[in-house]
Amino acid sequence: MKLYNTMSMQKEEFVPIEPGKVRMYACGPTVYNYIHVGNARPIIMFDVLRRYLEYRGYEVTFVQNFTDVDDKIIKRANEEGISSEEVAKKYIAEYFTDAHALGVREATVHPKATENIQQIIDLITTLIDKGYAYEVNGDVYYRTLKFRDYGKLSHQPIEDLQSGARIDVNDIKENPLDFALWKAAKPGEPYWDSPWGKGRPGWHIECSAMSNRYLGKTIDIHCGGSDLAFPHHENEIAQSEAANGCKFVNYWLHNGFINIDNKKMSKSLGNFFTVREAAAVYGYDCIRMFMLMSHYRSPLNYSGEILMQAKAALERLRTAKSNLEFFIANGRDGELSEADAAFVQGLDQYREKFDAVMDDDFNTADAISVIFEMVREINTAVSPAADPSKTLAQACLDRFLELCDVLGIPFGSDSSEDPEAKVIEEKIAARQAARKAKNWAEADCIRDELKAAGIVLEDTPQGVKWKRA
């Protein structure tokens, strides 16, 4: 399995620190608003990476944090007339509502910055003791020039960064590149007691402290959006490696941006749609499929046309699943014939192709193409004309769902638990009864009623199949 490492700018063979186990960290949201579609991309794509690693047999410890103390949260609290804690609590709950609807599994641990204040203070103290940080008037800053590898992730020499840094004549920092580890308390802001007085942590130190606490000094994979590579991840490296004296991360993974009109979708530019807004139009399932149909490192353009393409692709997969379920219920009885057994064994080629493209930097776009190849072959073998057995249909469904589950392809609720599906089945049964009684007018009336509701019927020797138009 190969992963593209931002640090080396090339694909590298994935070798975990501990055989059979993976320690993985993803930077989570700053919880002051609903997540937008751009925020959802790393959440979905690194959920897929975690799923694939587990499918390959790894035991994955996945940590995704919440930044629950920050200038933006404080600003939102002031606007809404509530505490920062209440803002964070509200939007963490909203995050999980959206994430669950997107088919994203919860991380092993979802730590909050405010639950790790002592770990943050301890890490800052270590950096001060080692000469990598200094205190000024209750603020603590990282001494960037002391860490000579600064800029190695973003591939920017420290000299270039220094010459391009903005100089503030009133700056109390030793160097314009220095960044805050601890911020002295201001009136009306949340604070904690520390050796440097009352204050709160800076953003960058939070992730270093939480990663260190829950995953250890060196971890396998750290992932996030491309916009986090500099300065956030660069600063994490400086903090963690200076404090611990060892390599922080073995594989750095960054997803590409989602663009609108060739500009990155972001709250700061105001050109964003929340996941909830997009889901109201296209559905959460469609948003996930939209993400899966592109390689995670490629830029992705957000448009109604592309989302509708994703919706159509998802519907094709759902139709394939319902077709197999139909023949599991209505196909011939009996064991697999010799020819059927050979056919099922032949489907293993698609798992091999799927594994090959996913092993190549978890290429979900190519993986979905492989699944569609499999579907085309299955649809030929499991069709009314082929008169398939229930056993063959079940074997095909098992192999189809195994690959779909790795990507978290959303099929919606089970039709047996879908109230609308039950009503449709009842109407189909009533139509069948009318046909049996040769009441053709009533049978046609029921068919027309279902058609008007967007339900298409197909009469087959095995029974009546239906799908949504």
Task: Cite the ranges covered by each PLM segment.
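N-terminal, positively charged nucleic-acid-binding surface of large information/translation enzymes
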Residues: 8-13, 17-105, 462-466
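Short, glycine/charge-rich beta-strand/loop segments that flank catalytic centers
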Residues: 66-70, 92-95, 105-120, 138-147
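Structural preference for alpha-helix termini/caps and helix-kink/transition segments
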Residues: 264, 272-469
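Short phosphate-binding/catalytic loops that engage adenosine nucleotides
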Residues: 58, 132, 455
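Short catalytic-loop micro-motif centered on adjacent basic/acidic residues
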Residues: 108-111, 222-224, 390
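Alpha-helical recognition segments enriched in aromatics with Gly/Pro capping
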Residues: 1-32, 47, 97, 118-325
